[in-house]
């Protein structure tokens, strides 16, 4: 076990799979006290079991629906009561976005649920955790944008997803402004296509589409959760103590080409 995050109490949402799982396991391996959550109880338990087997245990509140304010407050209050502080908040949870062209997208059934699952739950968690982050005196918020906050897609119709991730960029910059006087840093990570169960279910990590996207990267492959987790470790650690309001493109070079 390393110790880049030793002594840090970190909330990591969406630990049941994908990037959230990767961040939770990597943070624990780096010495953080991790309190995760997930809406899927079995998935959260599997991550807790994996961390236990690795000798770097984590805790979890599950099931937890982060689109419900009372559930968010329960999660934050549980962590704060158990550990007395919150130093890091990683908003990795998201609801699978609806993909449809703007002409076909239903407002109530597709557009609004996508924004609720990508923007509302980040706002709610930041709001609930904010007093504890301020009290910590030197804290870090890590939110997730996407390459699709910067560019559209010819392969998939993602009007709502692009809107949601663009909103995360803007919200996080404002969080950095508001948090600066209190020592609360806020940054975004904008991943490219990461191989997760969710992206596989969307058909994005295999076949012709995956090949097309991989070919657009400068490194010739799709990303993995740990590629993103290492960046999150840096942003959570004191190594990034003068970094705030920034975005980190972890995309294999897609946005550079």
Give residue spans per PLM region.
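Short C-terminal tail/terminal secondary-structure segment
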Residues: 2, 96, 100, 232-233, ...
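Short, small/polar-rich loop/turn modules that mediate ligand/substrate recognition or access, typified
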Residues: 138, 180, 185, 243-245
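Catalytic loop of short-chain dehydrogenase/reductase
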Residues: 142-167, 172-181, 193
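Conserved mid-core segment of classical short-chain dehydrogenase/reductases
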Residues: 73, 95-112, 154-160, 200-204
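C-terminal helical subdomain
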Residues: 177, 188, 211-239, 243, ...
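Catalytic Tyr-X3-Lys loop
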Residues: 106-124, 142, 168, 219
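Canonical Rossmann dinucleotide-binding motif of NAD(H)/NADP(H)-dependent dehydrogenases/reductases
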Residues: 3-35
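Amphipathic alpha-helical dimer-interface segment in Rossmann-like NAD(P)H-dependent oxidoreductases
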Residues: 117-135, 149, 176-177, 181, ...
């Amino acid at each position: 076990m390393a110790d880049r995050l030793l002594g840090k109490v970190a909330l990591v949402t969406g630990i049941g799979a994908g990037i959230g799982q990767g961040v939770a396991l990597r943070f624990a391996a780096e010495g953080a006290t991790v309190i995760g959550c997930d809406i899927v109880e079995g998935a959260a338990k599997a991550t807790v079991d994996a961390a236990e087997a690795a000798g770097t245990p984590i805790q979890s509140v599950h099931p937890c629906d982060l689109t419900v304010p009372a559930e968010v407050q329960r999660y934050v209050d549980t962590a704060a009561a158990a550990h007395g502080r919150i130093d890091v908040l990683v908003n990795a949870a998201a609801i699978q976005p609806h993909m449809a062209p703007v002409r076909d997208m239903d407002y109530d059934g597709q557009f609004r649920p996508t924004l609720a699952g990508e923007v509302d739950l980040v706002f709610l968690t930041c709001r609930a955790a904010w007093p504890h982050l301020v009290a910590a005196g030197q804290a870090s918020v890590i939110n997730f944008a996407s390459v699709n906050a910067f560019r559209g897609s010819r392969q998939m119709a993602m009007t709502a997803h692009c809107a949601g991730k663009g909103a995360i960029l803007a919200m996080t910059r404002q969080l950095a402004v508001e948090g600066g006087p209190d020592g609360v840093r806020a940054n975004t990570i904008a991943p490219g296509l990461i191989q997760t169960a969710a992206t596989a279910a969307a058909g994005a990590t295999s076949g012709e589409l995956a090949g097309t996207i991989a070919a657009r990267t400068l490194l010739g492959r799709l990303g993995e959760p740990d590629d993103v987790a290492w960046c999150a470790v840096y942003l959570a650690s004191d190594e990034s103590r003068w970094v705030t309001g920034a975005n980190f493109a972890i995309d294999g070079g897609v946005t550079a080409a």
